[in-house]
């Protein structure tokens, strides 16, 4: 990805399940280094759009590029530049935090896995628990390991799928601090039902309803009160 290129380009992206279009003709460009929050009611297509952009699903139509790579033509190369943090743990519960991270580091071909894993465990504040099985961790601690796992191969774009689900307020604060600490020049894309939190975190906001983009704009161009009303209006639209 050349300097100044957008981190994500979606062009007429569509995903159908039978006769229903979960994502319907979605187009937008997101500058590199941005934090995009995607909002919308249940069934709006938020998670489906995220899955398309992080190569977990194939589009029915249209194209998308992430980190300068066409997802349709070079999906494996794109995955090497993408990280994912989900509300569903992608960790092996009986393995230690260190073992989980080493597994993913080797999977991605990280040059010095042990050093990289040690660095990330220090970043997320879990060096002292590195040898403990993940199943002994709290929900908040598990999410901290998930942050480290998503960053183990130093991705350019990180996707977050409802990352606050099940976290208590203290764990949410720690999660936010860690994300701020690793933002650097990375691009983040988050799906969230928490309007206030998502708006606070983002540089850009995208609202969906019935699979379509209702609004996409930099946060600086949005008034929170008007934006909250727009969100409430989309909730009233329901699903297709």
Ranges and model annotations:
Residues 62-70, 78, 215-217:
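Conserved ABC transporter NBD signature motif
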Residues 102, 106-129:
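Conserved ABC ATPase "signature" region
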Residues 54:
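Helix-to-loop junction immediately C-terminal to a conserved catalytic motif
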Residues 39-41:
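The feature captures the beta-strand-to-loop junction immediately N-terminal to the Walker
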